[in-house]
Amino acid sequence: MAARGYGWVPDRPDQRDYLYKTIRPVVRLPKKVDLREFCSIVENQEALGSCTANALAGNLEYLDYRIDDVYEDVSRLFIYYNERVLEGTVDYDSGASLRDGIKTLRKQGACWEKTWPYVIERFDRKPLKKCYMEAKKHCIESYHRINSLPEMLTCLAEGYP
């Protein structure tokens, strides 16, 4: 039996990335940071290579919860489809890179899971127009590349997983 991958595709270098270290200098770090109380439940990607979409959906749900103390699932399948649009692989369960997923959240946003549910058999179908209209109201404003462990730890200490 062949080993099954989860669908992560390494990011290609992109000189257009905003670097995290240009935003804030590294601060004195706490001994421990635990953000789990603000995180939504980890969801099962099942047999689909949608790990980046699952991770990014969880991250967006975290950010939403920090703003309004309410959890609502965003559509992992919507994110996964649009990641693969950028990569030109919508017809395949090809996996995707985190950068393309983040670009998707910046450009298209994410609709709610109840609008475009995680039905694996629909992974290659374009989401409905209403999904894109809803998603436009739910975009991230910016993203910044993290290049080192100290930058990652600083980011976590500032409350950004």
Name the predicted role of every residue range:
Residues 1-6, 29-31, 37, 58-61, ...:
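Predominantly the structural core of cysteine protease catalytic domains
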